[in-house]
Every structure is written in C-alpha cells, then in structure tokens.
C-alpha cells in the first residue's frame, strides 16, 4: 500500500528540506528552528499526543509580531510545494494516476465485453462524443500567476530527477535549479497587491491554453486514437475533435459591474490576438518542416507556377503572412485605432483549415502519411479545438437586468410598465415584438446607464464574428419571459443567427420549476422554430446548496435534470445540460468520473458542458500531461454513462430521497435562516469579514453590499467555513436526515441504494471526503479564541452534529473509517494536515489579535494583516479547494 506513496513522500521531504535551507539563508537559524519545532509538534499532535497539541497552541499564541509572517509563509509555501509534488506524482511513472490515460482503454474493454453492445454502437457513441469545458475565473485561484509558473518549473525538475541514468553533474544542476526556484518563490510576495481586473483574469485563462492545453489537447487525441485503433480497429477522422474550451472570463457580468461591454469587446480581440500568436509559432515550424517537393495535381493547381518548387512551404508562407496581417490589425484595434479591415484578414476557422488540410491530403496521397500525421495533424486539431477565437466566451447576466431594461423602454414608449405586467402579458408582448418586422428601440432614446450597458452588451454580441460567442446564460432565471426577453434584446441589436440562450436555474424553487418553465417555452411555436431543435439549460449547483443544504440541493438538481431530459426527448429537442459545478463539495464539485455516472440516465446524450473553476483549472489542466489525464477521465465517463446508463431509481428510492430532502432542508434552514445566533456565530467563528480584504477576483463578494447569508455569494460562504475546518455548508442537514431515516427502520434500504445507485453512493462519498477534511478540535479552537461565550453552545451543537453525521454515514457505507475506498486521497489529506494545522491555529490567533486591535480603536498592524492573508491562502492550499 505505502510503496506507492514512498516516491511522493520522498519528493515532499526533499522539497521541504530545500525550503528549510532557503528560510535559513534568508532569515537565520532561529526562525528555521522555530518552524521545525512547530512542525514536529504538529506531527505529534496529529498522532494523538495531547501534551504536544497543547504546546503547539502555546507556541503559536506566543509568537512575536515579527515571527508571525515568516512562520505563516513557511507552512503556506510548504503546502504549495506539497501540492506540486502531488500533482507530479499523479502523472509520474511511479504514481497512482500514471494509469489515467488507460481509463479509455479500460472503458473500451469494458464496453466490448458487454454482450448487448456491438462495436458499431460503441463507434457511434465515440463519434458523437462532445465535451465543452467552460473556464471560469472564480475568485478562488488564490495562487498568483507568477508563483504558478515557478511551480510548473519545479514539476519539470522533479520529472527530470526521476531519470535513473542522470550523471552526477546533471543531478547537481537540477538540484541547483530547484534551489533557485524555491528561493525565488520565497522572496516573492504570495499575496496580490490589488484585485485582478477582468482582463487580467482573461489573460490568466489564455496562459492556461498556451502553457498546457495547446500541447495537451493534441496529445490527448493521439492517445484516444491509439486506444480506439487498438481496441476497435477504428481511426479518428482528422476533423474529429470532441473537446472545446469556452471561457467566462470577460463575459460573466452577473453581479460584477467591472465586466462591461467594452471589456467584453477587448477580451474578444485579445483572444483572437493570442490565437494568431500561437498559430504563428505552429506555422513557423511547418514552414521549416514541410520542405517536400512531391505533391498531388490538386495541390499543384492550388499553388500555381509560383509555388510549384516547394508547394507545401509556399502554402504555409502564405498562411503565415495572413496570420501576421491579422495580428497587426488586432494589435491596432487593441490600442484603440479604428482601421479598415485589411485584405487577407482571418475571421473564420475554414480559412486556417483549408490550406493546412490541402497539405495533409496531398502528403497522405503521395505516401508521406508519417509526415502528415506529425506536427501538421496536431495543428489541424488545434484549428478544430481553438480556431480563430482561441476560446469562445459565454455572456452571463442576471434576469432582473433584462426585465428592468424592458421596463424602462415600455415606460418611455408610453405603453405601460413591463416590470409590473403579469407573466402572460409579458409573454404576449415579447412574442408580438419578436414576430414584428419593425424595430422596437427608438433612435433618439437616452436610457439609464444600466440599461445602456445591457443594450451595448447585445451590440457586442451582434458585431462579434459568428462562433466567437458560445451562449448567453441568464442567471436567476425563473420564468419563460426571462428567456424570451433576451431573444428580443438580441434581435433588436441586429444579431443575424440563433444564439443559444441558456436559462440558469439555481435556487431550490427554481430547480423545482425548471421543467415547467421549459415546457411552457417549448409549447410556443415561434420559440420552437427559433431554436431549431436544440436547447441548452444550465443547472446551478452552488447557489442551490447555499439555499437549501447539500442533500436537498443535489436531489433537486437530479430531479430537474431527469424531468428536462424526458420533456425534451418527448418534444424531439436535443438538450445540452450545462453543469455549473464548483471545485468544492458545497458547490457541487466531485471527482469527474463519479459525478458524471451519478447523473440521471440520458443526461450526457447532448454531450457534457461543465464549468471548470478557479483553482480546479490548475489542478486538472495545469500541465499537458495532467490535461491528457483529465480529458481521458471525462471521455471514459461520458462513453460509459451513454452506453451503460445508471439504473432508473426505484420508486421507493425516490420516496426516501424526497424524505431526506425535506428533513435535511428543514435542519439546514433551521440553523442558517432561523437561528438568531447563527449569523453572529458565522461572522465571528470564521474569517468571513477578513476574506473581503483578499484581492482575489474581479468580482465583489456580495451581490448586495448589505444583508445576511443569503446575499453572500456562494464562494465566500463556502470559503469561510473551509478555513475554520467545520466545512458546514457541505454536510449540514444531510446526516441528521439519514439518521432519521435509519431510525425509521430503513437502514438496509439505504445500504442497497448505496450499493446499486451511483447517485446515492456519490452523495455519501462526497460527504466522506468533506468529513475527512473537517476537524473538530480545530473548529473548537476557533470558537475558544474568537467567539463570544454566549455563542459557544451553538458551536458545540454543530460539532456534535458533525460527529453524529460521520457515524451514520460510515454505518450506511459499511466502512470502518473515512475514505476507505480512496486511500490515495486519505493519504494526501493526512500528509498535508501536519502543515495545515499550524496555519489554522495561527489564523485563529491572528484573527484574535486583529479583532482586538480593531475593538480598541487602534490602527491594524500590517505584519498581522499580511500574515493573516498568508494563512488564508495557505489553508486554501492545504484543503486543495477554496470556495
């Protein structure tokens, strides 16, 4: 068992040693001794030594203000290094997930062994594979880009050090490079000084494409092709690329006033500029490689006399000059210059594809397939995956913004107030206007700034090259008129094609009404004509969990999807479900394979579209090899879910879920909404107020500046509870509901559900993962240090609940300890706890000092503030997810 982890452990301790040397060089022996003492006490405390636990608390409470920052930074940096070692371990030959690309082979073998699945059926399922990953800049990627680059290089060093045949001088050279990188990280400020702008976030997204996806996607397709050839004797067509990337960075304006129409326009141009930049590098390589002379008559006809001597090079040089022209024009536009479009400007993917594909066909026909299937094939696949836009963007806006804009317009036109009309009147007005030939917007109308912004955004969509914007997502969608309103605003902007408009259902009530809303829409003839048989619906995970607790939310999500799938199937509509999952459990995060197989049967027929958020992007796509691994996992899961769908839940299972849902929602809301002590307890037991000071994302932490838990965004809500290790949003209510159903004599039925129904077993698995990261003594320590005595009983009550919940989940899952079937994750949590515990204790101490200073009306000590930020970032690294 432990053989597998010894390589990981030795890398972690080597990196720790180098970090120790760096700290000693920078700050002297005494600080290193202090850090080492704390580490040893923490290790012993974890092993159950109470005296050492007490000493750990005393030591950290007695640190001077000068020692706070170095100690916090030491443990925080160590966790970043441990995460890097773990990321490397997951792709190293010695590691667990070195077998991830085999996932595809394993899945194909499993499918081939099914007596009722023909190879033709499997092949058809492969051909209809569709995977769209939507990168979002949630304010959760705590680590600065500059440190991420250094960690990627550390990864490269670890990879090279694994080479058995290294000469001594090579090993010494690599160790010297590691020391340099770790020293550079130590001497870099890990906390950003200001919040990133939406454009900075978009650039972060482009960096992921350049550093990882650009190489990772073609590598994944080679892997997929190899497995298909080996297992099914089937080759992927050249133009078959089942994966695409979309981004919310620069397009998501929901509750983020910093994302304006101008920003979106700028990001679209920047994205195209980055695409020309990356394709130019590819084409440069092809210019030097494709020196061949022999070509088909078709290719020779294409290049004419001028290019006959080196036909492939001739085409590549032409393409290169078009890319350079395009890049220069985009650069001028980005600088604000208004230039006419030059001749040869690239705006469509076909213009990139055609010359490349002509070369490919000619090389194949002339017996040079080995050359055609080299760099040229990779570039062709990049054209299909990224193309001229590089990544498409989604626009997301809150439904009330559209309602307010139309209200302002109808009042100006003197035809009443749209906002106060009934739903039936709204629909009648919208359908009438959608069918009308005359424009609705008056020429000389001067709307308010808010309405102007909504109209300008629609204008940007209408002007953007077709294919650069993927969808318009309406958050907090509640009614059919919410969807029709967006179609009308887009029509008024002069959009010439049917843009996918996706309602996002995200509260418990909205999820329960989702099917009704979509049924009404599909009953409108005009609407059916517009969508041409395709509909996208987005399911919100994070807000529903914050609204009703994780058990009720996940059942509502399941039922909404199930009903929508059946409604669309009956209506002959191809449904794409868009999953708005977060990285953490309380926001719907789950290991990809388990999460997909736990969805209702048929949910992946229209492909998978899912958000990849903040810090998860780095864990899943931070390196080309990890990209191959993540895409392979998704591919295997989609094929399996479509060809071996999970069972339809039995009626009795549905009834139990209904019961669990009602009880857990009541318990959850009983605390979060109805207990008068809850909000004051939350504010004092977690760093919620201090989190607002972290310059994390471009988006404010609250939708409205005042208000209680309901106005907090889902991310800071989860983030705060993750920091104090109570992890409350990810379990509150679930265990109590399970306990009640067990007391009603249904334990054996729950055990059957756990064994035979992926939806239910995944839910329990997610609870176990949260329980493994939660920590009762640390949560209690936060209470003792930070919470007023009269609120202590509430904290104790919540911790007792957590303890009971762990027992009931283990009983139903028939496990003696948490994470019994995922030892790799359990190992990883244990490894990091030794370094996370001191950060938690220190954070409670810093919050105590910082709040005391504030109560006494004194100026905050910058050393305390800075160290506090570092502990927040460090605990986030230790928990491997933020919000």
Curated annotation (Swiss-Prot):
Endpoints of the signal sequence: none
Residues at the catalytic site: 138, 546
UniProt enzyme class: lyase
GO MF annotation, one: magnesium ion binding
SUPFAM superfamilies the record matches: Phosphoenolpyruvate/pyruvate domain
Pfam annotation, one family: PEPcase
A Gene Ontology cellular-component term: cytosol
GO BP, one annotated term: oxaloacetate metabolic process
Superkingdom in the source lineage: Bacteria
Cofactor(s) demanded: Mg(2+)
InterPro entries, A to Z: PEP_COase, PEP_COase_bac/pln-type, PEP_COase_Lys_AS, PEPCASE_His_AS, Pyrv/PenolPyrv_kinase-like_dom
Catalytic reaction annotation: oxaloacetate + phosphate = phosphoenolpyruvate + hydrogencarbonate
Keywords: Carbon dioxide fixation, Lyase, Magnesium
EC number: 4.1.1.31
Family named by the database record: Belongs to the PEPCase type 1 family.
Entry function: Forms oxaloacetate, a four-carbon dicarboxylic acid source for the tricarboxylic acid cycle.
Protein name (record): Phosphoenolpyruvate carboxylase
Phylogenetic classification of the source organism: Bacteria, Pseudomonadati, Pseudomonadota, Gammaproteobacteria, Enterobacterales
